[in-house]
Regions:
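Catalytic cores of nucleotide-sugar-dependent glycosyltransferases that transfer UDP/GDP/TDP-activated
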Residues: 1-332, 343-349, 353-367
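Intrinsically disordered, low-complexity proline-rich regions
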Residues: 336-340
Length: 367
């Protein structure tokens, strides 16, 4: 069995782009391939008890607490203090794989609109410089924190309204799970674990726990950011309901462990079935062999019975070879032909001698 960290990624790695040269093998083993998403520690990432955030909260009071945490973070980072501002967070390695080349293409447009952007992380120099530049260009809208702080990451999860993850590929992803836990709605590209853990918002039936876009395209990403911002400002009720649904999701390790338990139980049952199938096959083969032996013994017994009956009746039970041999013996007993009389070769010289021979050969007359 082969396991990976999400169902979608288990499908993706069967394709050349994601398979890294192993796609052919993984396609051949597709029936043995499973995907189970990672979990996060719900004790560590718990807005109700988190000591690193300004105001603790739960599902019951998340809306008010979000505004208070946002204001506290704005003050900490030197952003404009506005609880109604649309705050977008990024906590990530700053690399191409995380989709930051898409962000680079449209960052000017994002910052020019009514959006606050908070970035935390380190990585490639070009992205570090990019965010630093925009934080200086838009000091009240962009905060670039080019380092990593666990405590600050918790405050970003608790304070932001949305969390951006436009990854090129993402086997599972953890940041979107943390943001869901804190009621921050993920904006993700539909790949790997991001597809499996974030349900895109559907305004028709009022479902969803975040926002998503399909193609690896900067303008498609920008469009979904604008859609999220529009929903936040124009339909706050739908937004707040989505926040509640997000917080009620269970992506704890307990949930992941239950999935692994099901997988391993299935493997145990599968192995038991395999062994039982082998046992039944062996039993079937043994029964077939015993049946053949019984049939052979029955045939021998039948022949012995027939032979005994013939013997009791005075009939020799001759085999074909025996009958052939008997015929040959009888043929040898045929009477021999009588020998022909010997030819008379004596020469008679006188009439008296001839008369004497005739007299001897003539049978005597009975009186």
């Amino acid at each position: 069995r082969i396991t990976t960290v999400s169902r979608s990624y288990a499908s993706e790695i069967r394709m050349p782009f994601y398979g890294e040269g192993l796609d052919g093998l993984l396609r051949a083993r597709s029936k043995q391939l499973s995907g189970i998403v990672n979990g996060i520690d719900y004790n560590v990432y718990n807005p109700k008890t988190d000591k690193d955030i300004a105001v603790n909260y739960s599902v019951e009071d998340v809306i008010k607490a979000k505004a208070a945490n946002k204001t506290a973070l704005q003050k900490e980072l030197g952003l404009e203090e506005n609880p109604d501002a649309f705050m977008l967070g990024i906590v990530s390695r700053l690399t191409d794989q995380k989709g930051l080349d898409l962000v680079e293409c449209v960052l000017d447009q994002i910052c020019a609109e009514d959006v606050q952007l908070v970035v935390l992380g380190t990585g490639e120099g070009k992205y570090q410089d990019m965010f630093t530049y925009y934080s200086r260009k838009y000091p009240e809208r962009v905060s670039a924190n080019i380092f990593y702080s666990e405590a600050l990451s918790h405050r970003i999860y608790a304070s932001c309204d949305a969390f951006l993850m436009p990854s090129l590929f993402e086997p599972c992803g953890l940041s979107q799970l943390m943001s869901l836990r804190y009621g921050t709605l993920p904006i993700v590209r539909e790949t790997g674990g991001l597809r499996d853990t974030v349900t895109p918002y559907n305004e028709v039936d009022g479902t969803g726990t975040g926002f998503s876009f399909t193609n690896y395209n900067a303008h498609e990403m920008l469009a979904i950011i604008r859609y999220a911002k529009k929903t936040y400002f124009n339909d706050r009720r739908a937004w707040n309901e989505m926040v509640l649904r997000a917080m009620k999701q269970d992506f704890s390790w307990d949930a992941s462990a239950r999935e692994y338990e099901k997988l391993y139980d299935g493997l145990i049952e599968e192995e038991a079935r395999r062994k039982e199938a082998i046992r039944l096959q062996q039993a079937r083969e043994a029964a077939e062999a015993a049946l053949k032996e019984a049939e052979k013994a029955l045939e021998l017994a039948k022949r012995a019975e027939e032979k005994a009956i013939r013997k009791f009746s005075g009939i020799e039970d001759e085999t074909e070879d025996e009958r052939t041999e008997t015929a040959e013996v009888e043929a040898d007993k045929t009477p021999e032909a009588a020998p022909e009389p010997e030819e008379v070769t004596e020469v008679l010289e006188t009439p008296e001698e001839a008369k004497e021979v005739v007299t001897k050969a003539k049978p005597e007359e009975k009186e």
